[in-house]
Design a protein with these regions (language model features):
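A glycosyltransferase accessory/donor-loop signature
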Residues: 1-7, 40, 54-55, 140-152, ...
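N-proximal low-complexity "stem/linker" segments adjacent to membrane-targeting elements
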Residues: 1-22
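Short, acidic, metal-binding catalytic loop of nucleotide-sugar glycosyltransferases
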Residues: 27-35
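Short, polar loop motifs at secondary-structure junctions
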Residues: 42-48, 99-102
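Active-site-proximal specificity loops/subdomain of glycosyltransferases
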Residues: 46-85
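GT-A fold catalytic core of metal-dependent nucleotide-sugar glycosyltransferases
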Residues: 61, 74-127
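Conserved hydrophobic/aromatic beta-strand scaffold that supports enzyme active sites
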Residues: 81, 152-154
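A short, conserved beta-to-alpha structural element at the edge of catalytic cores
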Residues: 117-140, 275, 283-285
Length: 287
């Protein structure tokens, strides 16, 4: 059974998601003992530098039309992962992530299910984030949706995954109608992949088959949204946590945020966190 990670890297404005995918791929090569493959999905106009391609397992052109062509926030193609993945077992990631610790042992646990959505995330201190608050997850709470994070989402090529991604496609293409009909207690104004995946799980009635809320260590990520970090009020200036918390980075396996060494897949969110110095350090660790 082949295994690997997958991301979509579509640049938007001055945000270089392809460079983030490169850093993610380097971090996987530097830290994972077994599964370190990363497939990167790009639109037809994206030119992938040769040094990037060397660390990507596969570069896949996003099939059919580019649903995100006219979108500033390039998430509209996120229903296509099932069709783009070259692996039997796949974990979907967000591009703005790095892996400081080895999570290869998670794969055998994840493979017990056909779908497994991350529903618990960590603060920078490694504590369980109290993200069942109203700040980021208001519409999940009000509509009793599973607390899905598509920044770490496992699927296996299977009948259940096929059915799931067919519904995900339908919701993506008709998201306003679905949100209006099936989220009576409030809905986001914009398309959200987390909401779409959660709604598909709810509509199919497969929450027990695809989530394990009481299991907080596998799978999980450190999620650097500012206001789930459980710090004293006023400690963060705004959503850019990097303005308030320092990072101490000498190598990927030991870097610290605010004096706490990172160990879980690290979703840095603030794109300015990934500096050229961090990328250079990753390159030196891999080559």
């Amino acid at each position: 059974m082949s295994r690997g990670y997958i991301v979509i890297a579509q640049n938007s404005g001055d945000t270089d998601y392809l460079k983030m995918a490169y850093a993610l791929a380097l971090s996987l090569k530097a830290t994972q003992s077994t599964v370190s493959n990363l497939t990167v999905c790009v639109d037809k106009d994206t030119k992938v530098p040769s040094k990037y391609a060397k660390v990507f397992d596969h570069v896949v052109e996003i099939p059919w039309q580019d649903d995100a062509k006219d979108s500033e926030w390039k998430i509209d193609n996120k229903w296509k992962y099932y069709y783009m993945s070259p692996y039997d077992e796949t974990v979907i990631l967000d591009t703005d992530m790095v892996f400081p610790g080895d999570v290869s042992h998670w794969w055998d646990i994840l493979s017990e299910k056909d779908l497994w959505a991350c529903t618990n995330v960590k603060t920078f201190r490694g504590e369980n984030a109290v993200d069942h608050n109203m700040y980021y997850r208001e519409y999940f709470i009000k509509n009793n949706l599973p607390n899905v994070y598509t920044a770490f989402f496992y699927f296996k090529k299977s009948d259940l995954a096929t059915e799931f991604f067919k519904l995900v496609e339908i919701i993506f293409q008709n998201w306003q109608r679905f949100f209006f009909k099936y989220m009576p207690n409030g809905k986001p104004d914009n398309l959200s992949a987390d909401v779409v995946y959660a709604l598909a799980i709810q509509l199919l009635g497969i929450e027990q088959e695809s989530t394990v809320d009481q299991l907080t260590e596998v799978p999980t990520i450190t999620h650097m949204k500012s206001f789930i970090q459980d710090v004293p009020s006023g400690s963060f200036l705004d959503e850019k946590w990097t303005l308030s918390l320092p990072t101490y980075f000498s190598d990927i396996k030991t870097f610290k945020v605010g004096n706490f060494q990172q160990q879980y897949p690290f979703h840095y969110v603030d794109k300015n966190w990934l500096t050229d110095d961090i990328i250079k350090s990753l390159e030196n660790e891999v080559t």
